[in-house]
Amino acid sequence: MKLTPMMRQYFEIKENYKDCILFFRLGDFYEMFFEDAETAARELELVLTGRDCGLEKRAPMCGIPFHASNSYIGRLVAKGYKVAICEQVEDPKFAKGIVKRDVIKVITPGTYTDSSFVEETKNNYIMTIYADLERNRCSLAITDISTGDFLATEGELEKGVILDEISKFNPKEIILLDSLDQELIKDITLTTPALISRKPIEYFEENFEEVLNNQFGEKSNSLSLMVKKSSNALVKYILDTQKISLTNINDIEVYSLVDFMTIDLSSRRNLELTENLREKSKKGSLLWVLDKTETSMGSRMLRRWIEEPLVNKEKITLRLNAVEELFNDLSLNDSLKEALHDIYDIERILGKISNKNANAKDLIALKTSIGKIPNVKGIIENCTSSLLKNYHHNLDDLRDIYDLLEKSIKEDPSLTLKDGDLIKDGFNGEIDELRLAKTNGKDWISSLENREREFTGIKSLKVGFNKVFGYYIEISKANYSSIPEGRYIRKQTLANAERFITPELKEIEEKLLGASEKLCSLEYDIFLDIRNEVENHIDRLKTTAKIIAELDCISNLAFVALENDFIKPEINEDGETKIENGRHPVVEKVIPKGEFIPNDTIINKDDNQLLIITGPNMAGKSTYMRQVAIITLMCQIGSFVPASKANISVVDKIFTRIGASDDLAGGKSTFMVEMWEVSNILKNATENSLVLLDEVGRGTSTYDGLSIAWSVIEYICKNKNLRCKTLFATHYHELTKLEGEIHGVRNYSVAVKEVDNNIIFLRKIIEGGADQSYGIEVAKLAGIPDEVINRAKEILETLEMESSKDNLDLALKEVNASKEDIEEASITTSYEVKETLVEEDKIEIKEEVISKASEAKTHKKEDDQIQLDFSAIGKDNLIKELSEVDILSLNPMEAMNRLYALVKEAKNLI
């Protein structure tokens, strides 16, 4: 059997869109066949039927009404499918044989612009990634076709670089060079939910000069070769899917990776910049606190500012000064916010115009928005800060476009472009004449109705209209006998009435319908002319939209600063950050007002380079560390900060290692993920970076974890190429020994108060290390049953005693084995231990194994815990440690523990 002509046409079209679900237009429906039908029926919950296609088996089929297609398309795209829209491209009335059909658009997650599915305050990005494998370089191009943003960059071909940019832009779709390393492709796939397509190298490299010149003109000439190739693939993909060149994409913003603060994927999540960790929603994020913008454009711009903090001091200062000016003039800023409030999303209206799907209501929204600009410009006319002065100078009031739309488009136009009722009276003479003819015709119909009622005496007689029969005279059957013979021609019989026509009625009908059809067609053509004229000024409109968005951000930051008691930070590049009474802007927003406990911070490249923070869980260590990072980031987007005073040193990167999470899909345990994150930090941080490390080493055994944490601290502080500012929270109290041993390490802890065997977290960061972890008390606060709490205390006491006894037993063995070594060291006796008692076990300590110490002075008080040296510091350091032991301050148990540690250290040096 042979395929039917229509199915042959279907397969010919489908052959070019194998990766899409093909919506095949048949009359008033989009039909899907074969595998597409099965997929669509499953995903959209449609009834799967069949259709004769010329094969032995019927073709699986399902369909949707074309007028309701948007919701179905949106659901498929949201699930990661591509949808190819195949339309009838000729009028079936004039078709000879099968109606011509062709795909007019391919809708994908990255190119879908329907306002019902694209969030107003988020960009809908699509990204291409190209690589020169020989030179180990990569380039990325990113666009949002709904706004016209088009960005590009290049850098080293490193996984971290690519994943950081993906996490920053969060694209809905990514087009990859298919020769990229398979491990990198796997990492990208695991990092993002974006729809990923792979293209051959030719897609990136062929015809790039021609393609880019057609899209951007001479602006593309200055681009680097790498950027040209990634941009080429992106422009091609837009042309392949949209089937037209989008005029709102008319410029490329090339940025350098060093122009903005680097924040990796893990840090973006941990700091909850734009969404919270739990629900992945905006509420509870920094953006939630900061975003009180008046426009969708401003909200998207603010999101981008948060994702891309500045690192240039001068640019940061420009924003801060502009925010300060509006902050200091409440009345001015209130007026500005009010003026911005009624401005619609100009960027996305321009996207619709560029994509040829803007209707008359979109143009009215554009006109309304343009009409607000003179007021906005007037409000900031006398501003003195450089940024606001520049906005005023460059803000185009677009008066010519406003005047065109004001005199041409009706205030409440039809939603459907081909139904007329779009153009104002007086704009076009021919339209006015056709409307007059249409109005006169309706008057004539009304006159005819009255005349026939009088002639027949039938008061219920009426003249009606429908699209099938046109105009008719309707008379009820009850009055049928009153109809004069031969006056009317019967047209239709109803249950309770008869419908008639007359030659005169059909004549006026022809004139009326002709005028209506011609009027609708003429209005449509004139509307397209007006829309095209607006499109000719898309450069000016885009520039104005960007200024409005930035102005909205500045005004918003001033408003939020006033609302939340933020202050203007000072900014420096000398490496020291000082924060007085700093607060976490999100946490203080979600707890009762006035309950947040502020904290000070001093961190620099010298004596306060690495802050070791100890204290119990739930005491506020993680909140404190995050707040330092967020205050720094807020400053670098140009925002005021939650503190009473702040002097922030510009950082180039923020890294965080906070929280625990498995990477099951990637085959990595919690500890492996933690080590990977630490490795990434140590490799990529610089002396100008800010690093937050929380509980490094907790995912393994105690001594392994302690060893790793200790070594990481040493590496950060002693590596001349690193020495980054670091906040290091830990439960390893042994690490507090490093203050004084390693330059730059300082101990801090979270204050805790004990009242009647209960603990109270004071949330205050104080100098000095914590003396215990309070883990059982935290468990009690969390609601663990008393029976479990009491048993935990018993077990803890037992473990502590066993641990102490084991240490003493080991000490005895080590000391007996090393007696001669100790005596040869010429160490004099300074303290004698007679005996000690551990529960029921009595352990006698002989005089010959008593610890001896040198006569050197005591420098500092010693911690009462074992000092474990994992770095083999050498004989000089051992002698120094011995000289610093204050034997008189130690009890017998502590003395033995101390002796054991020193002997073990001495043996390692042999």
Curated annotation (Swiss-Prot):
Binding site for ATP: G615, P616, N617, M618, A619, G620, K621, S622
GO term, biological process aspect, one: mismatch repair
A GO molecular-function descriptor: ATP-dependent DNA damage sensor activity
Record-linked Pfam families: MutS_I (PF01624), MutS_II (PF05188), MutS_III (PF05192), MutS_IV (PF05190), MutS_V (PF00488)
GO cellular component: cytosol
Alphabetized Gene3D superfamilies for the sequence: 1.10.1420.10, DNA repair protein MutS, domain I (3.40.1170.10), MutS, connector domain (3.30.420.110), P-loop containing nucleotide triphosphate hydrolases (3.40.50.300)
CDD domains hit by this protein: ABC_MutS1
Keywords: ATP-binding, DNA damage, DNA repair, DNA-binding, Nucleotide-binding
Residues passing through the membrane, by range: none
Domain of life: Bacteria
Role description: This protein is involved in the repair of mismatches in DNA. It is possible that it carries out the mismatch recognition step. This protein has a weak ATPase activity.
Assigned protein family: Belongs to the DNA mismatch repair MutS family.
Protein name: DNA mismatch repair protein MutS
Lineage: Bacteria, Bacillati, Bacillota, Clostridia, Eubacteriales
